């Protein structure tokens, strides 16, 4: 599986990529025409000041944790539903997902969306696929009801069999 290989950079592939970046790179990146963004920050952190030009931005605030407790805000089912709605709305648009490090929360969101939408994934900050398990599980839960309502069998497959390994196998090179 190639998640950070940039050798195949045809314009068609570049437009289909789901890019996962750390915040420091996301804020200085100029978006492609029609590109959309999912921006993930900690709840009380300032929003990322992204370059102008994104067709749409979904801003979410939750901590990079995989368990409820303490003073942490975990990804909620509502967050997950918003991600799926955004993905469905912009299924053909270039997509960039970022969080602080670009290595856990955004990897979970990017991996799930790439598998569901049958798009290649590019990880910029890491070559290790370690998505936040809570994030993936919230997306799987939200995907179940959406998949039945929309009769989206690919989404249902991601929801039912959405382990990190199985999601990764669904992503085209």
Where are the language model's segments positioned?
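Helix-loop module immediately N-terminal to the HCX5R catalytic loop
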Residues: 58-96, 129
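Short, low-complexity, intrinsically disordered N-terminal peptides in bacterial proteins
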Residues: 1-14, 161, 166-173
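Short, well-structured alpha-helical interface segments that form or flank functional binding sites
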Residues: 32, 78, 82, 104-108
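A phosphate-binding catalytic loop at a beta-strand-loop-alpha-helix junction
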Residues: 95-112
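Glycine-rich, flexible N-terminal cofactor/catalytic loop recognition
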Residues: 2-60
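PTP/DSP superfamily signal
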Residues: 88-94, 111-173
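Short, glycine/charged-enriched secondary-structure capping and boundary segments
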Residues: 51-54, 110-114
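Short catalytic/ligand-binding loop motif for oxyanion handling, primarily in non-cytosolic enzymes
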Residues: 46-47, 68, 104-108
């Amino acid at each position: 599986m190639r998640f950070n290989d940039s050798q195949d950079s045809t314009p068609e592939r570049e437009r289909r990529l789901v890019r996962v970046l750390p915040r420091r790179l996301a804020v200085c990146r100029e978006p492609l025409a029609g590109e959309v963004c999912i921006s993930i920050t900690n709840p009380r952190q300032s929003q990322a000041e992204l370059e102008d030009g994104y067709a749409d931005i979904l801003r979410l605030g939750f901590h990079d944790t995989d368990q409820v407790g303490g003073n942490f805000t975990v990804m909620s089912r509502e967050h997950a539903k918003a991600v799926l709605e955004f993905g469905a709305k912009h299924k053909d648009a270039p997509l960039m997902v970022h969080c602080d490090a670009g290595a856990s929360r955004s990897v979970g969101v990017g991996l799930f969306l790439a598998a569901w939408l049958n798009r290649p994934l590019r990880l910029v900050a890491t070559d290790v696929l370690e998505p936040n398990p809570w994030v993936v599980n919230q997306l799987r839960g939200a995907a179940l009801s959406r998949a039945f309502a929309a009769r989206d069998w690919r989404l249902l497959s991601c929801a039912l069999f959405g382990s990190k390994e199985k999601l990764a196998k669904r992503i085209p090179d």
